[in-house]
């Protein structure tokens, strides 16, 4: 859980974050359906690069146009993946942003999977 925002130059906390107790905002049946749909995005949809994770995962890809172009005319886009892992009882929510991308070596889902694998290896 994120504890604080740090000053990049000094490493000192700029803002300490509080964590209010969670509360249900949608019915349990709706939440279960949404989770199942997000798991399908990983299993069969646009985020299959995260499909091999132990415990499964769910998530959503996204692309946002920036209106910025290279001198050659290619548009720079913001590529997103937001996911949770493991699927059944999520412990982590991870968001990957590839800012101003034209071509990427790895998808956001693949980067997400690498982070999850590192978390699993760390115990």
Model region roles, listed by residue range:
Residues 1-9, 13-21, 38, 42-123:
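Active-site beta-strand/loop architecture of penicillin-binding DD-peptidases
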Residues 19-24, 28-29:
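A structural-propensity feature for long, helix-poor, extended segments
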């Amino acid at each position: 859980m994120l504890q604080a925002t740090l000053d990049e130059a000094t490493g000192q906390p700029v803002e300490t974050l509080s964590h209010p107790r969670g509360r249900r905002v949608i019915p349990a049946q709706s939440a279960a359906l949404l989770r199942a749909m997000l798991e399908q995005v990983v299993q069969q949809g646009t985020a299959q690069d995260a499909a091999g994770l132990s415990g499964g995962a769910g998530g959503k890809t996204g692309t946002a146009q920036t209106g910025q172009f290279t001198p050659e005319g290619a548009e720079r886009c913001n590529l997103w993946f937001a996911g949770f892992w493991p699927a059944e009882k999520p412990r982590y929510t991870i968001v990957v942003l590839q800012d101003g991308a034209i071509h990427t070596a790895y998808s956001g889902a693949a980067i997400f999977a690498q982070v999850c694998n590192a978390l699993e290896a760390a115990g």
